Design a protein with these regions (language model features):
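N-terminal glycine-rich phosphate-binding loop for ADP-containing cofactors
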Residues: 1-197
Length: 197
């Protein structure tokens, strides 16, 4: 562990990045914030550096548009907790190059992840399914079940953990931001449970 920790260096200024092969951005799930960070990364890293965003739902094309190298911008969605969860969604933007994709998929294998190439859609693969799963779980709470009961049934069904445990690990603020963003386009007639809000 000491050897691994010695390889990690914290910085507070993008200009301190040096000349990395890849930068994986990990800030909160808000488009304005990501579009503020990516031009800075673009300005201080060599043109060959891959700029990856660890977004769980946001449009990689919009993030890439904030740079001068959209062919080097890609999504790398690590699921929480990243040291346990094997899935790594590799999100191809409209202009992401084949070489960028190949490099990130190779990195996924080196990290022991199950890399899955996905396109642009709200929630990609994992969170697209998780959205419906948690929606139904919230309805169960409204009908009288407890979070522990719902999680236990899901666990007994064969999942690694239930939706409420996932929310606790990933951060309730993350799912709250996603719900707020999706509220703008949610059909009026779609049943919504405000219980998590």
């Amino acid at each position: 562990m000491d050897v691994c920790m010695a390889l990690i260096e914290g910085i507070t200024n993008c200009a301190q990045l040096g000349e990395p092969d890849i930068v994986i951005e990990e800030i909160f799930e808000k488009m304005d914030a990501k579009k503020e960070v990516f031009p800075k990364l673009d300005a201080v890293t060599p043109p060959a550096t891959i700029l990856a965003t660890n977004t769980s739902t946001l449009d990689v094309n919009e993030i890439a548009s904030a740079t001068k190298r959209p062919e080097k911008v890609i999504g790398t969605h690590f699921f929480s907790p990243a040291h346990v969860m094997r899935l790594l969604e590799t999100v191809r933007g409209a202009k992401t190059s084949d070489q960028t994709i190949a490099t990130v998929m190779k990195l996924a294998r080196r990290l022991g992840k199950a890399g899955v190439l996905v396109g642009i859609c709200d929630g990609f693969v994992g969170n697209r399914m998780y959205h419906h799963y948690t929606r139904q779980a919230s309805f169960l709470l409204e009908e009288g079940a407890t979070p522990e009961q719902v999680d236990r049934v899901i666990y007994d069904f064969g999942f690694a953990m239930g939706p409420f445990s996932v929310g606790d690990i990933a951060g309730l603020d993350v799912s709250w931001r996603i719900r707020r963003r999706r509220a703008e386009t949610r059909p009026q007639d779609e049943r919504y449970s405000p219980i998590a809000d």
